Amino acid sequence: MKNLEIKRHYNLDYKNTNLLKKFVSVDGKILPKYITVLKPKNQRKLSKAIKLSRIAGLLKFLNN
């Protein structure tokens, strides 16, 4: 899997599901830092945005 990154012009928001789907595995798990190559602050923001999106019903909890 290739390394992913968040560009500066992207808005890391829980409603931006197209961006968040890039950081979720096929199983529905949040990708770890060594794959996303994000700084710790951005990794935390990403995981919070994914969790909020799941609670809001925009992303699935698990992909079966």
Curated annotation (Swiss-Prot):
SUPFAM superfamilies the record matches: Ribosomal protein S18
Predominant subcellular localization, coarse grouping: plastid
Gene3D superfamilies: Ribosomal protein S18
InterPro entries: Ribosomal_bS18, Ribosomal_bS18_sf
Pfam families noted in UniProt: Ribosomal_S18
GO cellular component, one term: mitochondrial small ribosomal subunit
A GO biological process held by the record: translation
Similarity comment: Belongs to the bacterial ribosomal protein bS18 family.
Quaternary organization: Part of the 30S ribosomal subunit.
Protein name: Small ribosomal subunit protein bS18c
Gene source species: Bigelowiella natans
